[in-house]
Amino acid sequence: MKAVHFGAGNIGRGFVGLLLHEAGYEVVFADVNAELIEALAAADSYDVRLVGDETVTKTVTGFRALNSATAEDELVGEIATADVVTTAVGPRILRFVAPVIARGLGARASGAPRLVVMACENAIGATDLLAAELMDGLQDGDTRDELAARAVFANTAVDRIVPAQDPASGVDVTVEAFFEWVVDRSPFAGAEPPIPGAHFVDSLGPYIERKLFTVNTGHATTAYTGFLEGAATISEAIAKPSVLATVEAVLEETSAALTAKHGLDPEELAEYRAKILNRFRNPHLVDEVTRVGREPLRKLGRNDRFIGPASDYARYVGGAPSALLAAVGAALRFDLPGDSQSAELQQLLRKTEPGGIVTEVMGVEPGDALYEPLVAVVRTAQG
């Protein structure tokens, strides 16, 4: 079995690539980072260090690496004979990898098994987004029906904290021991790919939102409030009583929204929240608040980790989610030198009236239940 994985970074090597390797796939990593690809191509193996109560090291072997910018034809050939294609490149980069996947699909032999395509990104419906981009990249003569006959597109929810790495580690990577890879089984019609580390479910939507609006919302809240409190790492931040109280309040609101919207069990969500907070406390995972907090404009987007659950809360629970609004205020004050989105956000705060920021950055229009509360939050952040 063979899997082509786009994104040879820390998540690609330490999460998706590791699980595919353990499932018995030969993994072909594809990336535009020439230095990283050269290092992987020169390595016979790399280690994944799992840190938690105990530290376990797993070794990945039998992989190859291709530069997707300079070896596209070779990559097309790999996709043409692959069983699985996965990505961990970021939702905004999917449009750049779609054309080569489309070429690979077009090169598959007649009668070849359908290629399993899964975008493993921190976004709702990421594989749907990739599939839509693939349609635009189809070769002349290809049709949507032909594409559907060649591939199975399955949405996923992925969860593993992968901090910034020590440059001296080379291609080795340190990650938390916990992971979750949930896959929508409905496109497979009972023929799910053999990936023991993945959990196939009938209804993925609640799993994706549970993860994004608990792990990602909690992680970002810890980062932004911890940054304002002078904490350097996530574990240091969550150890501060004021930060912990803020994060707990935020996650109680996201859980209330998840329960009201999807009917998730409140007691199970409480256990899930406790598990997430313990992950944030992991002292062996040196995860800087600046890494987690970067790209605040994206994280303040309409369907992302703050405005998404806040909107659901207003719609399904009723009222304004005060803790989530406070977290938005902390995100607005994330002023990090060297982060382009942070700089752009601070520029907007200096030059744009509050309603404009709520509409342009957060995607919330006048008349929405959240509009006026968010305007007040922005106005406070502007001083």
UniProtKB/Swiss-Prot annotation:
This protein's record includes keyword NAD: yes
GO MF term list: mannitol-1-phosphate 5-dehydrogenase activity
InterPro entries hit by this protein: 6-PGluconate_DH-like_C_sf, 6PGD_dom2, Mannitol_1_phos_5_DH, Mannitol_DH, Mannitol_DH_C, Mannitol_DH_N, NAD(P)-bd_dom_sf
Recorded coiled-coil stretches: none
UniProt-listed Enzyme Commission number(s): 1.1.1.17
GO biological process terms, semicolon-separated: mannitol catabolic process
UniProt keywords, alphabetically: NAD, Oxidoreductase
Residues the record lists as binding NAD(+): A3, V4, H5, F6, G7, A8, G9, N10, I11, G12, R13, G14
Keyword field contains Membrane: no
Catalytic activity reported: D-mannitol 1-phosphate + NAD(+) = beta-D-fructose 6-phosphate + NADH + H(+)
Cellular component per GO, a single term: cytosol
Pfam families documented for this protein: Mannitol_dh, Mannitol_dh_C
Stored PANTHER family: ALTRONATE OXIDOREDUCTASE-RELATED (PTHR30524:SF0), MANNITOL-1-PHOSPHATE 5-DEHYDROGENASE (PTHR30524)
The family this protein is said to belong to: Belongs to the mannitol dehydrogenase family.
Designated name of the protein: Mannitol-1-phosphate 5-dehydrogenase
